Amino acid sequence: MKKIKLNDEVIIITGKNKDSTGAVIKVLDSKVLVEGLNLAKKHVRSNPNAGVTGGITEIEVPLAVSNVAIYNSATKKADRVGIRTNKDGIKERFFKSNNEVIV
């Protein structure tokens, strides 16, 4: 079970966007794509057949999983994630600071 999943609220802990929060759009093997953060400019060639106008666009670039942490809204801080098995035998993720289950 992965500790960071799709639509999790994460906080960036290093880099130019430090202390910024956002939702995870896509999870790759060891990288995550965070909505509206870690933007880079890409030069796009126009393609009239596809209806694409040329110019400079901003795209989101993946971040390493080690540079983000899950955001705990109860404590308003970054938190660590633990994995445990509940009474029904189903694995669940929880915050290590206050033992709340991550929904």
From Swiss-Prot:
GO molecular function: rRNA binding; structural constituent of ribosome
An example Gene Ontology CC term for this record: ribosome
Signal peptide start and end residues: none
InterPro entries: KOW, Rib_uL2_dom2, Ribosomal_uL24, Ribosomal_uL24_KOW, Translation_prot_SH3-like_sf
The keyword rRNA-binding is assigned to this record: yes
Source organism, top-level taxon: Bacteria
Disulfide partners: none
Protein keywords: Ribonucleoprotein, Ribosomal protein, RNA-binding, rRNA-binding
GO biological process: one example: translation
Primary role: One of two assembly initiator proteins, it binds directly to the 5'-end of the 23S rRNA, where it nucleates assembly of the 50S subunit.
Family designation: Belongs to the universal ribosomal protein uL24 family.
Assembly with partners or alone: Part of the 50S ribosomal subunit.
Protein name in the entry: Large ribosomal subunit protein uL24
Biological source species: Ruthia magnifica subsp. Calyptogena magnifica
